[in-house]
Amino acid sequence: MKRLLIVAAAAALASASAMAATPAGLWKTIDDNTGSPRSLIRITQVNGEYKGTIEKLFRTPDQDQNPKCDKCEGALKDKPITGMTILTGLRQDGDEFADGKILDPENGKVYSSKASLDGSGKKLEVRGFIGVSLFGRSQTWVRAD
């Protein structure tokens, strides 16, 4: 009886954590070339859509500590990158989050986007692409909260 109770409790915890696995939270992005932290992005959910806003940039002392998006177009042109919403429109589609858009502040381009969590919920693979996701690039973000 005691063993059955332990198994049931473990199953309930596993089920609850699986149901709670969403991209909402604080994520650390990693520089592809150096492996160093690059930024912190806060992902929030509003009306079934996830969006991500840059909360902090990790910059070296010789870099501009408050860079602006000089390559962005429209309303984002020359706006501070810190505080900028770069990920929009992600919606849950089964185990994946799809139909989003992601802005690369380095080149000012907006790409289609999708994302998926690993089994632990501690890593988020974010893919930006043009047209078909085959033609794109992925980054792994690490949960920071």
List where the protein language model places each region:
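Central antiparallel beta-sheet cores of small beta-barrel/beta-sandwich binding domains
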Residues: 29-113
